[in-house]
Amino acid sequence: MAYSLRLIEDQLAAGAAASTPRAPRVLYAVSGALLGGEATEPVPAVGPADLAAHAGSAGAVLYRVELVRQPPPPAGGRVLLEHPIDLAGGAGWLMRCDRVDFEPGGIAPPHRHRGGGIRCLLRGRLEVTVAEGAPRTVQPGGAWFESGREPVLAVAAAERETSFIRVSIQPASIRGQSSILYVDPADAGRGRPRRYTVYVDEPIAL
């Protein structure tokens, strides 16, 4: 079975319901308030287990990341990025949403991940180099896909903080654990001027 991961922007009016999931998905509030299920307090993100979610009284702009079978169903919003993802041979999967915050000049040394995912820059600037490719400069709103197999080097803007949101499909066996694998294992013990905030880390059924 062929799958793709896609990033969609949804603009919701005040109190409007978010898209009902037809596939495993994460919703992240870019602006405005997002409320999951019967909750009365806003949350940064909701995961696949939250079947109902809606915007707050001022509306909301959401990033929706879905894992869809090919051919994909209608998106129902503005598709910012869609990329095939290889899920062959897995014994079980989870959907993870986290935010990565770099201090000015922060660097993520060459690394891989245990699964693929989509990233979207929220603020700052990030120079991303995948394998032997040319560096790519990503600005706020820019999205990219990492398979997890190729080594990636990321360098944040020197003059300001940089942040991106990430939704990835990881082996279920690493729930609650980091997915990162450094090309040079010594980098794992060196200073890392960046912070991770995990919002969603839920098993999914394909």
Q: Residue spans of the language-model regions?
A:
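Short histidine-centered beta-strand/loop micro-motifs
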Residues: 17-21, 108-113, 130, 155-157
